[in-house]
């Protein structure tokens, strides 16, 4: 279903953003 693909993509993007935020915090 289209919404499942959409949900998966949103989850991937959110995970990547969270990972980047954590990396930024560690680097500061």
From Swiss-Prot:
Compartment(s) where it occurs, according to its Swiss-Prot or TrEMBL record: Secreted
Cellular-component GO terms for this entry: extracellular region
UniProt tissue specificity: Expressed by the skin glands.
Matching Pfam families: DD_K
Spans traversing the lipid bilayer: none
GO BP term, example: defense response to bacterium
The UniProt record lists the keyword Secreted: yes
Family matches, as InterPro entries: Dermaseptin_dom (IPR022731)
Alphabetical keyword list: Amphibian defense peptide, Antibiotic, Antimicrobial, Secreted
Function description: Has antibacterial activity against the Gram-positive bacteria S.aureus and E.faecalis, and the Gram-negative bacteria P.aeruginosa and E.coli. Has antiprotozoal activity against T.cruzi. Has antifungal activity against the yeasts C.tropicalis (MIC=10.9 uM), C.guilliermondii (MIC=21.8 uM), C.albicans (MIC=21.8 uM) and C.albicans ATCC 1023 (MIC=10.9 uM). Decreases viability of murine peritoneal cells. Fuses to, and disrupts liposomes.
Family: Belongs to the frog skin active peptide (FSAP) family. Dermaseptin subfamily.
Name of this chain's protein: Dermaseptin-DI2
């Amino acid at each position: 279903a289209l919404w499942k693909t959409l949900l998966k993509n949103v989850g991937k993007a959110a995970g990547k953003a969270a990972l980047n935020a954590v990396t930024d915090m560690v680097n500061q």
